[in-house]
């Protein structure tokens, strides 16, 4: 089976947005107009094609990023649907890792909201070219020009406006196309599938001319010859203008801005045209970078069917009919059904079936090519973020980074039968979602699950009950505190055990230093002259790492520190890897005891949107929760309050906020950083948790 479209006609993109910016509805309309979906599914009726997990249909929020393939203007579009709720930033992060371009959707009333800023920064991190789609212009209070200003003020981006809305709120009926200088009007009776062109309305002619001039000025900056011609009075034609806008978008010089109302079926075809015109193809992206595992040298793969095979597994899902599916982005080479691959873990994996996914239906395929996003069935060892590559020419692509969980709770199975099922369920869920961790409390024997927020854990517990039929008692959520060394310390620690026969001996000299926040655990080996044989060094690192993970003060992990191993001693007979591991464990405990431990807590960035009359109450309440107000800002007839608040003081906040604002305020919150717990609170915690 040959490739259906040449690589330059591929567009791998995602739609990223705040929770209610209409992302799923936009994807639905794209599937409808590209001919894949014959009945439009509305999110608020719980029928959207992309939202295929039961919990998503009930809650009306997108949780898992399903990948879908469709076609437009003889181009092949692979769309990755990303969730907008803050507890699922991990899903967005892994989608961005495998996308070539992104459409940022904004609510036409609110403009750029806090979660939009987070996702935008994630896209900056991966260097993803993007464009903006200002949606919901049919809503009361929608203001396109205000939204464009928020793109400048809150994201620091340079907007290149391509379309202006005709009419606003309930009068919104079409767009002014600035590139082709015409108006586009949609026919409501055809569900937006039909539209016609007409002249730009007379009352918008001046505004259209002003915005078109701005657009041309931005575009000609991309090319000296075009700039010279423009300065001499020659305007670029539509084709030249598009080429210049494409060049600038791919170079991150500006972001094209479109608008519409997906719900009212206006503007989606213009969005699809812009994806084809301005979003990158896999050939516009730099070669994917990695490391050759045989030599440890940097290596790369060109985007080509002829290059050795390389791919990244970016999502694992359990499908009720096929079993475990590994969603994979192929960067180079080709893949056939039944072929063997090498995974990062140096294990051979056989590809059972290869599926092209439409939101919840699937098509079996025999071959896949560079640039494709496919689901593979039958992989046993591969987890999220792993590289798959050809056996003869291995490469390890850069791994994804996953944030540490900030909240935890205990789960106890109700019966013996549930216990076995729960083990299987939790392992499967953890394989799907790297920001979800499972551990056992050594003292109580309880199973502890950890995640990125209350909703995150609530949905996972819900899935455990529904998909795996596990009945369990769930404890109250607890904050995931961390411990941190108060100062640097130099240690000389010996472990010695002589009791007849072979003894145990290990001695290490180390400098243990607290690191920058977020630096993690760093181990440096500077042993000279073989004072400790090389084969024992990994055991020493393991001893420090594992002891730090169990904590010292009240049993929370010690984070962000460096261990510099500079000297030590060993015994020809009595030394072993185990002896040095035990020695390192003792040294870590001694370091914690002598350096002293500070307690750290997760601090959340909270944004509350409230009507003016409740502003005082909202600020007073945040202050009472040990919060620090960062600023307030007027949004239409409401106020947006931004604050940093300890997670420990945010449990149950939603109910209290609703009660004192009569349900008129809403908020969003996401993890920002760890900070030291004040002394009086730390004392209370020690008494409670010790």
UniProtKB/Swiss-Prot annotation:
Residues engaged in binding GTP: 17-24, 81-85, 135-138
Keyword tags: Cytoplasm, Elongation factor, GTP-binding, Nucleotide-binding, Protein biosynthesis
InterPro entries hit by this protein: EF-G-like_DII, EFG_II, EFG_III, EFG_III/V, EFG_IV, EFG_V, EFG_V-like, G_TR_CS
Gene Ontology MF, one: GTPase activity
Domain tr-type G: 8-283
Keyword Disulfide bond recorded: no
Alphabetized SUPFAM superfamilies for the sequence: EF-G C-terminal domain-like, P-loop containing nucleoside triphosphate hydrolases, Ribosomal protein S5 domain 2-like, Translation proteins
GO terms under cellular component: cytoplasm
Matching Pfam families: EF-G_D2, EFG_C, EFG_III, EFG_IV, GTP_EFTU
Compartments in which it is found: Cytoplasm
Top-level taxon: Bacteria
Gene Ontology BP terms: ribosome disassembly
Function summary: Catalyzes the GTP-dependent ribosomal translocation step during translation elongation. During this step, the ribosome changes from the pre-translocational (PRE) to the post-translocational (POST) state as the newly formed A-site-bound peptidyl-tRNA and P-site-bound deacylated tRNA move to the P and E sites, respectively. Catalyzes the coordinated movement of the two tRNA molecules, the mRNA and conformational changes in the ribosome.
Protein family: Belongs to the TRAFAC class translation factor GTPase superfamily. Classic translation factor GTPase family. EF-G/EF-2 subfamily.
Record-given protein name: Elongation factor G
Gene that encodes it: fusA
